[in-house]
């Protein structure tokens, strides 16, 4: 009989000193590729260098090494975020009027940048109130700082320094986990352990820690600020933490300590953990006692979730078992095989995460205005508009990224031999039905939604307003949306008897809340104009999905090009001699999808901007009369294309066009410059590569004549490179134009 040594109890999950630290590679551009490492012969080299520098798949086939590189890069990413955040806090500490704003947030505007007087640029320092001259900011940091209980600039300095120290730790961790103690592949594939730690640690303890900070620091400080106490008189955070009597003066249940908790008498704590709903009438933000309660509850939920998965003790869920048990009567093998995909293809994993995070970011955009989480956020219209726009764009990019990485997974990581009759295989087998149906939906939505507008424009031009679709003629009321609004407005009386208001004032039923004579929020009426533009949203979103999904489902093969998987993720055409096979690569679908994403988000932020100015934002007189910024013109004007052009784009562009010579002049220059960037993109998108190559050769001839020819031969951009440069400038130009248009407008009138 053979005697084996006992199995080691502890698995070895890291490798020590796998790769020595060396700066030599920094001096070799393209060290990761044999071809690129030789250096440039033509100008194509620099483009290929940019395209492949972060494409770890192309550097090596070793999944363990790729995983380590990605893991290490995550720490670098966190370091960059912390450095950026530190800069924001430092600006708040060094260059801002935060303390002045804190003492009078309704009259003083936030500013954290003062322009130096160089060649007249100090014109950008507008008067933001309280005798401070600077650029008005719309990031929402001031409101966030107030909500977290920051009362002076020293605290901002300390936080900024702390963030820099943490950034240094992250950079160290990135180096350490690649060069000193690199995790083995098994570590990255241990999904149950990862779920437990991320759920319980990051989300559970993170939320619990934030709830603790809110209860012990934010709530008392904000309670005193709301009562009008001077920020300089308010005790410092550590005093509240160390001296329970201070807290007990504001929240009497603190005097009882933990007794109510251990005697299950939790309702005693209802003075600082509330469930009120609606907004605080002093600040126009959510009740901070509601948000503290929320974070406590979320923390508990995630702590439970972090104990659900099976690791060393043989109890709990196994993700593989859950997936393989997931079969229905009509779904074949169900989710069998997906576990192997998600533990060996980081592109597949990333695609799912981007799709969910993108959707979540868009949900955040909609909640930031309908349930404004920070004090005085709702009445800072510039910040409201900026936060909505920012989160919509970010969400759009993340969703397109999801499709991009799903397609890369299909091309590089999908193994058809291991995926038989599971849901992924079944979707791929009936992809023609999916795409042709989706195409039909797009055509239907496009013709009908656009047709309603065309009808209205025609009737308007013919002087027949009674034949238009509008709230005053032929009504197309969004009855389902109105029903949802109504249900939510009156639900709390049945579902949450102690709540004083519904989750959001936008649902209806409640009164409006005004802060300092400005509307914070009120019930948002929906009518025919919203019904029309909603169907344009449906149309643009479905077309975006059509393009992206077709790119994923046909990434490996199609009737036109059965061997597409061999050509890779990006290729210009299927070789010479096969006409009509250009723009079919998975990369090209992402490229085209980006334009439709841009269409979709543009119409959403235009809808939001005009709707809020027309029906929500405005001032309120002593008699209680509300004057909206554009006087409620959305319902009538937004029913025609001409109305959108005349009463939204043209009417509201006057501020940015006339901004020269004022503190908003930077937006005028940006508006002009970003239009040029956008137009520049068309030069790449509508160009033929041969045209430029001919031009280049003529210019090279002239250089040769003068004996100043370069050693590196100039080359026209490849087709794919040209498209990449084109779409980048198209999006940059379009987004910066919109940014300048929105901010010049809302800072002037808001």
From Swiss-Prot:
Q: Report the family membership.
A: Belongs to the PsaA/PsaB family.
Chain's role: PsaA and PsaB bind P700, the primary electron donor of photosystem I (PSI), as well as the electron acceptors A0, A1 and FX. PSI is a plastocyanin-ferredoxin oxidoreductase, converting photonic excitation into a charge separation, which transfers an electron from the donor P700 chlorophyll pair to the spectroscopically characterized acceptors A0, A1, FX, FA and FB in turn. Oxidized P700 is reduced on the lumenal side of the thylakoid membrane by plastocyanin.
PROSITE patterns given in the database record: PHOTOSYSTEM_I_PSAAB (PS00419)
In terms of superkingdom, the source organism counts as Eukaryota
GO cellular component, alphabetical, reads: chloroplast thylakoid membrane; photosystem I
Swiss-Prot/TrEMBL keywords: 4Fe-4S, Chlorophyll, Chloroplast, Chromophore, Electron transport, Iron, Iron-sulfur, Magnesium, Membrane, Metal-binding, Oxidoreductase, Photosynthesis, Photosystem I, Plastid, Thylakoid, Transmembrane, Transmembrane helix, Transport
Q: What is this protein called?
A: Photosystem I P700 chlorophyll a apoprotein A1
Question: What does the record note on quaternary structure?
Answer: The PsaA/B heterodimer binds the P700 chlorophyll special pair and subsequent electron acceptors. PSI consists of a core antenna complex that captures photons, and an electron transfer chain that converts photonic excitation into a charge separation. The eukaryotic PSI reaction center is composed of at least 11 subunits.
Which residues make up the binding site for [4Fe-4S] cluster? 573, 582
Where does this one sit in the cell? Plastid, Chloroplast thylakoid membrane
Q: List ligand-binding residues for phylloquinone.
A: 692
Primary localization class, coarse: plastid
The entry marks the following residues as binding chlorophyll a', namely 675
Its placement in the membrane is given as: Multi-pass membrane protein
Q: Which residues bind chlorophyll a?
A: 683, 691
User: Which reactions fall under this protein's catalytic activity?
Assistant: reduced [plastocyanin] + hnu + oxidized [2Fe-2S]-[ferredoxin] = oxidized [plastocyanin] + reduced [2Fe-2S]-[ferredoxin]
- Going by the record, the broad EC class of this enzyme is oxidoreductase
Recorded E.C. number(s)? 1.97.1.12
């Amino acid at each position: 009989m053979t005697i084996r040594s006992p199995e080691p109890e502890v698995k070895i999950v890291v490798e020590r000193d796998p790769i020595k630290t060396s700066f030599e590679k920094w001096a070799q551009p393209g060290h990761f590729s044999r071809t690129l490492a030789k250096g440039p012969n033509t100008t194509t080299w620099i483009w290929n260098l940019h395209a492949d520098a972060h494409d770890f798949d192309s550097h090596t086939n070793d999944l363990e090494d790729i995983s380590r590189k990605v893991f290490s890069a995550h720490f670098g990413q966190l370091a960059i975020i912390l450095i950026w955040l530190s800069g924001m806090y430092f600006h708040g500490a060094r260059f801002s009027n935060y303390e002045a704003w804190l003492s009078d947030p309704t009259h003083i505007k936030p500013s954290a940048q003062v322009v130096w007087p160089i060649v007249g640029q100090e014109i950008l320092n507008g008067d933001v109130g309280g005798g401070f001259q600077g650029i008005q900011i719309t990031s929402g940091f001031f409101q966030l700082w107030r909500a977290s209980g920051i009362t002076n600039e020293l605290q901002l300095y300390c936080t900024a320094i702390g963030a820099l120290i943490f950034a240094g730790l992250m950079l160290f961790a990135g180096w350490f986990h690649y060069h000193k103690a690199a995790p083995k592949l098994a570590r990255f594939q241990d999904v149950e352990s990862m779920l437990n730690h991320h759920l319980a640690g990051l989300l559970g303890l993170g939320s619990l820690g934030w709830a603790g900070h809110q209860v012990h620091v934010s709530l008392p400080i904000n309670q005193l600020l709301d009562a009008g106490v001077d920020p300089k008189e308010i005790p410092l955070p550590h005093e509240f933490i160390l001296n329970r009597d201070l807290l007990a003066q504001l929240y009497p249940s603190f005097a009882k300590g933990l007794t109510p908790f251990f005697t299950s008498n939790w309702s005693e704590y209802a003075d600082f953990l509330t469930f009120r709903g609606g907004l605080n009438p002093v600040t126009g933000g959510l009740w901070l006692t509601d948000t503290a309660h929320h974070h406590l509850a979320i923390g508990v939920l995630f702590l439970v979730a972090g104990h659900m998965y099976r690791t060393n003790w043989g109890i709990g869920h196994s993700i593989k078992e859950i997936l393989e048990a997931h079969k229905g009567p009509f779904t074949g093998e169900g989710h069998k095989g997906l576990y192997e995909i998600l533990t060996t293809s980081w592109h597949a994993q990333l695609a799912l995460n981007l799709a969910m995070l993108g959707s979540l970011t868009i949900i955040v955009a909609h909640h930031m205005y309908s349930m404004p989480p920070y004090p005085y956020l709702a009445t800072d219209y510039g910040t409201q508009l900026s936060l909505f726009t920012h989160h919509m764009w970010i969400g759009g990019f993340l969703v397109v990224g999801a499709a991009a990485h799903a397609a890369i997974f299909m091309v590089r990581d999908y193994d058809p031999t291991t995926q038989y009759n599971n849901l992924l295989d079944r979707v791929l087998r009936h992809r023609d039905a999916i795409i042709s149906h989706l195409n039909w939906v797009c055509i239907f939505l496009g013709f009908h939604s656009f047709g309603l507008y065309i009808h209205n424009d025609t009737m308007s031009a013919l002087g027949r307003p009674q034949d238009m679709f509008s709230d005053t003629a032929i009504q197309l009321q969004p009855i389902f949306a109105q029903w949802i609004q109504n249900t939510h407005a009156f639900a709390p009386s049945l579902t949450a008897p102690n709540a004083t208001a519904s989750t959001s004032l936008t649902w209806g039923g409640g009164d409006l809340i005004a802060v300092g004579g400005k509307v914070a929020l009120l019930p948002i009426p929906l009518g025919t104009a919203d019904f029309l533009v909603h169907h344009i949203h449906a149309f643009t979103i479905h077309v975006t999905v059509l393009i992206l999904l077709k790119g994923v489902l046909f990434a490996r093969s199609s009737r036109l090009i059965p061997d597409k998987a061999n050509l890779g993720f990006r290729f210009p055409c299927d070789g010479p001699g096969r006409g009509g096979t250009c723009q079919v690569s998975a990369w090209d679908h992402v490229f085209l999808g980006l334009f439709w994403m841009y269409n979709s988000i543009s119409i959403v932020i235009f809808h939001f901007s005009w709707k809020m100015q027309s029906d929500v934002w405005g001032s309120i007189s002593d008699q209680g009369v509300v004057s909206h910024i554009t006087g409620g013109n959305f319902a009538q004007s937004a029913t025609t294309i001409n109305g959108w052009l005349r009463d939204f784009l043209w009417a509201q562009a006057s501020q940015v066009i006339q901004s020269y010579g004022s503190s908003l002049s930077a937006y005028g220059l940006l508006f002009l410059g970003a239009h040029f960037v956008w137009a520049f993109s068309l030069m790449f998108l509508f160009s033929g590569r041969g045209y430029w190559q001919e031009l280049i050769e003529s210019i090279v001839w002239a250089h040769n004549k003068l004996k100043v020819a370069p050693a590196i031969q100039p080359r026209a951009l490849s087709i794919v490179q040209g498209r990449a440069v084109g779409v980048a400038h198209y999006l940059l130009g379009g987004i910066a134009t919109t940014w300048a248009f929105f901010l010049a407008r809302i800072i002037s009138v808001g």
